[in-house]
A protein has these predicted regions:
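Surface-exposed, low-complexity/disordered segments
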Residues: 29-33, 48, 103-108, 117-183, ...
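Bacterial Sec-dependent N-terminal signal peptides
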Residues: 1-27, 360
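Ligand-binding face of N-terminal immunoglobulin V-set domains in extracellular IgSF glycoproteins
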Residues: 52, 96-102
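Contiguous segments within soluble domain cores/interaction surfaces
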Residues: 19-36, 41, 47-48, 52-89, ...
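Periplasmic plug
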Residues: 647-686, 705-716
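Short aromatic-centered micro-motifs
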Residues: 46, 76, 189, 226, ...
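Structural motif
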Residues: 42, 191, 279, 652-654, ...
Length: 800
């Protein structure tokens, strides 16, 4: 038995030659196969129609949060692959959050949530996460039930992919089903020529897998008979026994990954065989066997992953760089690198609607937390999936795995995980394709945030290499003017848009010889450059089926509680609306007077004034070129005379009136160029104290909007960019209210607290705070965080 580490050291001093086929394949892998995956956390595993679905997304590049993408599309589909709703989510350090408001009339069925970055569309759709979400509706004519079908199939996988005569071989037996797998099952291995005498027997580790080891004989045909707990059985064939080849045996422990190679009837034994270990698309380990030997072993240290957990793919290549064996194994399966939250204080009560709090340490390396607090019903049902299984397992496989979270729980069976990985193959790349030089086609490159191209058309023609002005107004903020020059195709571009408020875009072209307005016959279209892509894959099978509902449809307690929570929310919201209406009716103040008080200050306030209100009244101003044109004939004693520049100048009592824009002295040309839709109020002062005769123009502030109901002809040069979807706010409030209109008889909330971004501030402890419902006696608290080095904090505790 030879030590490959020693052989590796000797091979390292050999002269550097031209790249071999394998070395080129490794370079190809490193440069072209970087890929992302998504884990999606939802606040509940099932919903009632009308619920709000809260979600938090984590995007990974390998086992670290991804820096590749800043945009995530999250889509909701029904069972017929019809798109119901979708969100564009802003990613910060690979994390983003949002919510779906489920409609009350959604039919009861299984829905699917798809989440992907634009960059992920370059690769197989099967790697885009599809989350199964059952939604219940008491008014639906059909009901979701768990299928009792026992339709499953089995397959046996030899370790390394080879089955060599005379060498002990480990097998994994894997069950699969479109619905549910049997709770437990057993099996036996037989020689087809002597079926009554089992060679070995085995029991399932879980619903997914089992394993056994046999030493095959040349010329023998072996079969496996599997029987589940209901009595159903199936017989499958093992692969044909080979007389020559290579056997790979792997054992993973906290010290590292030990592997053994055994050759049988090879021409040059294992000489010039190569062992390659990859983690995602990165080379982590490489060794060469330079001596004649039929058996070799070595220990791969955990430092290849810096001590982190993850999947290592071992691939064995012969002297001609042909792939002869491969195997997946987990690094440090019994020693998961998971941090726990540092809780420095808690105030937990069990009385209905009481206030509870949990304080986290402000001195931790972890600064931003995702926190979910739910009522725990005490059933102690294990999680089916979580961020651990998404990061280390299901995010990289397209096959269906039953309850993957079990492999990373406190009671996890490392043998079961190993058997599962024997039955899996790494499909994010194919070694034979790599060796042939195949490179994926990258049609969508990752880019920062959202981008748009703007196409102006004036008098029916594209504006090529033309200076234009873009006026950008974000939400309720003041507009900003930006100068652009269109390219040779007539486009201007807006890049790096990372807002979650609507962005108003208006484009203006410099007029020629002052003969034509910059917006006359000008049309503008805005086209997004970062777009969702139609789903081409297939939804996974589920354990649910639809049956015709009976006359008295029964609902589970959790769904009944969810529906009652919706009723409570509506009651409170309706009461708030009624109270607000009463306030508005009781106020009875003159809106014009209120606007004047809001905008006018000091010496500009005068009783002797004429006010035109454009915020609360429709002044039909849209057809006017400027405010001076509109004012003509509307105020007694106010006249206009055209100056040398052709601008109308206001006069009061045959004297030129002073002009003020937002109470700052200005000239007529400035006022004449002001867009009329930006004007909130015009005030005419006659003999007002220190000011005298004056015309005061006030522009829109904050959330003011023009009352004009007329269609504005100038809007052809404008468009609105939606940007990212802004997450709703999860309200933290008590339903314990003495107001009869808001009185809630039974608080049945399941989700008591949801915060996708809890963080500390100036060394103040991050505080988890929530109000109890009427029934909870204990709470399930989930805390997730990553530090700057992407170390994972995952803590789920029950507080009693």
């Amino acid at each position: 038995m030879k030590n490959i580490v020693f052989v590796l050291l000797i091979s390292m001093v050999q002269p550097v030659l031209a790249q071999t086929k394998l070395e080129k394949a490794l370079t190809n892998l490193e440069n072209n196969y970087e890929q992302e995956k998504v884990y999606l956390l939802t606040d509940k595993s099932q919903y009632a129609a009308g619920d709000k679905m809260w979600f938090k997304s984590f995007v990974f590049d390998g086992y670290n949060r991804s820096a590749l993408s800043t945009t995530l599309f999250v889509e909701l589909y029904n069972a017929d692959k019809k798109l119901i709703d979708w969100k564009t989510i802003l990613l910060t350090n690979g994390e983003g959050s949002g919510d779906f408001q489920l409609k009350e009339d959604l039919p009861e069925q299984v829905y699917f949530v798809r989440a992907y970055t634009p960059y992920m569309t370059n690769f197989n759709d099967d790697f885009q996460i599809v989350k199964t979400i059952p939604v219940y509706n008491p008014n639906s004519k059909e009901s979701l039930v768990i299928s009792k079908s026992s339709d499953w199939s089995a397959k046996a996988f030899p370790e390394g992919g080879t089955f060599i005569s005379g060498i002990p071989s480990k097998f994994a037996v894997r069950l699969s089903s479109k619905t549910s797998l049997p709770e437990n099952w057993t099996g036996k291995v037989i020689d087809s020529q002597n079926p009554n005498v089992p060679i070995t027997t085995f029991k399932s580790f879980d619903r997914n897998v089992a394993s056994f080891t046999i030493t095959p004989a040349s010329g023998k045909k072996y079969q496996v008979i599997i029987q589940d707990n209901t009595g159903k059985n199936q017989t499958i064939d093992l692969p044909q026994v080979a007389d020559s080849g290579l056997n790979l045996q792997v054992y993973s422990s906290k010290e590292g990954i030990k592997y053994t190679l055994k050759g049988a009837n090879l021409k040059q034994q294992l000489q010039n065989y190569k062992i390659v270990g990859t983690i995602n698309n990165h080379l982590a380990y490489k060794a060469n066997i330079n001596q004649l030997t039929n058996e070799a072993t070595s220990l791969i240290p955990t430092k290849i992953s810096n001590g982190a957990n993850g999947i290592l793919q071992l691939a064995i290549f012969d002297e001609q760089d042909n792939l002869v064996a491969q195997r997946l194994c987990f690094i440090k399966p019994g020693n998961l690198k998971i941090e726990k939250a540092e809780i420095i204080g808690q105030n937990i009560k069990h009385t209905p609607r009481s206030f509870n709090s949990i304080d986290l340490s402000p001195e931790s390396y972890f600064k931003n937390y995702t926190v979910l607090v739910s009522e725990d019903d005490g059933t102690q049902n294990p999680e089916e999936e979580n961020i651990l299984s998404g990061l280390w397992l299901t995010g990289d496989f397209t096959t269906k795995i039953d309850s993957p979270a079990q492999y990373f729980s406190k009671s996890a069976n490392t043998e079961a995980l190993d058997a599962l990985l024997i039955s899996e193959s790494w499909q994010r790349f194919d070694w034979n394709s790599l060796l042939s030089g195949s490179v994926p086609t990258i049609k969508t490159n990752s880019q920062p945030y959202l981008s748009y191209k703007i196409k102006p058309i004036k008098n029916g023609s594209m504006l090529i290499n033309t200076p234009v002005s873009l006026v950008l107004r974000l939400g309720k903020n003041e507009p900003a003017i930006n100068q652009f020059i269109t390219d040779q195709n007539g486009y201007a571009y807006l890049n790096n848009i990372n807002y979650d408020e609507p962005l108003d875009v208006s484009l203006f072209v410099n007029s020629e010889n002052n003969k034509e307005s910059g917006t006359d016959n000008l049309f503008v279209t805005v086209e997004p450059l970062v777009n969702p892509v139609a789903f081409k894959g297939n939804f996974p099978g589920t354990k649910y089926k639809l049956v015709k509902a009976g006359e008295n449809k029964t609902l589970s307690p959790s769904i009944s509680r969810a529906i009652n929570t919706q009723k409570n929310t509506k009651k409170v919201e309706n009461a708030d609306v009624q109270i607000e209406e009463v306030k508005l009716v009781g106020k009875k103040q003159d809106p014009k007077e209120e606007l004047d008080k809001q905008l006018s200050t000091g010496m500009f306030s005068s009783v002797n004034s004429t006010i035109f209100d454009f915020v609360n009244e429709d002044q039909h101003i849209a057809g006017s070129n400027n405010i001076f044109d509109w004012l003509q004939g509307r105020a007694a004693g106010l006249t206009f005379q055209r100056n040398n520049s052709g601008v109308n100048v206001p006069y009061i009592r045959n004297q030129q009136a002073k002009l003020y824009l937002d109470e700052t002295a200005t000239d007529p040309s400035m006022i004449a160029s002001l867009p009329v839709n930006n004007i909130a109020m015009v005030k005419i002062l006659k003999g007002a104290g220190l000011i005298g005769d004056a015309v005061l123009i006030y522009t829109m502030k904050g959330n003011m909007r023009s009352k004009s109901n007329e269609k504005e002809t100038q809007k052809n040069n404008s468009s609105v960019i939606k940007g990212y979807d802004k997450p709703s706010e999860f309200l933290i409030e008590t339903l314990d209210n003495d107001d009869p209109a808001k009185k809630i008889e039974n608080d049945t909330r399941e989700t008591l607290y949801w915060n996708p971004n809890l963080f500390d501030s100036d060394y103040v402890p991050p505080r988890i705070k929530f109000f109890n419902n009427d029934s909870a006696k204990q709470y399930k608290v989930l805390i997730i965080s990553f530090d700057e080095d992407d170390n994972l904090l995952y803590d789920q505790e029950i507080f009693k």
